[in-house]
């Protein structure tokens, strides 16, 4: 039997939901690989622990920047790894995967996420805008004829949307989010406390 999987592919972290089991993985969106051979050395938490601590030929990177794919091949490998880790076994049927994208991404960026997910082994891919997924995850009935404002602040983007009657009425995505907040705090602390 094929699995239904939901993936929140974020700049800072990735969450994997499996139907009937709930959220079973939450790990950093980091991949460590050998620059010389392009061999993946670690993914997720193990790779995050390598950030800034690797020899010259091992590079630990975050393959998404501001909510979009910055390294297609590495993102594909990361998605494949987390899908296999979530399923924990070989399946005869490829899974159906619903994956989140920021509300302001271009058609090219949407296509890149879709293609990377298919290449990672999906049978069917559904792209869902992050504010819609956040509303559903918060238990909001998005089918009602009243507006719900959703503000989803991730690591790379902040998505703001008004959702009503099952769709997005208006939305905006800005590329200022959690990573920028962290950097601003670090700059302030350095300036204030040397």
Residues of each region from the PLM?
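Nucleotide/phosphate-binding catalytic cleft detector across ATP-hydrolyzing
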Residues: 1-153, 161-194
């Amino acid at each position: 039997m094929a699995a239904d999987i939901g993936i929140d592919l974020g700049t800072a972290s990735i969450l994997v939901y499996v139907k009937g089991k709930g959220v079973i993985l939450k790990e950093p969106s980091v991949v460590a690989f050998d620059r010389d051979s392009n061999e993946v050395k670690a993914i997720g938490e193990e790779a995050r622990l390598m950030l800034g601590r690797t020899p010259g030929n091992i590079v630990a990177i975050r393959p998404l920047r501001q909510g979009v794919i910055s390294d297609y091949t590495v993102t594909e490998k990361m998605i494949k790894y987390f899908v296999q880790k979530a399923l924990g076994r070989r399946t005869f049927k490829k899974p159906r995967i619903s994956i989140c994208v920021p509300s302001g991404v271009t058609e090219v960026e949407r296509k890149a996420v879709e293609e990377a997910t298919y290449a990672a082994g999906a049978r069917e891919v559904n792209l869902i805008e992050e504010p819609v997924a956040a509303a559903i995850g918060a238990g909001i009935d998005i089918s009602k004829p009243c507006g719900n404002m959703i503000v989803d602040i991730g690591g790379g983007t902040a998505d703001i949307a008004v959702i009503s009657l099952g769709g997005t009425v208006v939305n905006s995505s800005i590329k200022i989010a959690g990573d920028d907040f962290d950097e601003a705090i670090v700059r302030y602390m350095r300036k204030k406390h040397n």
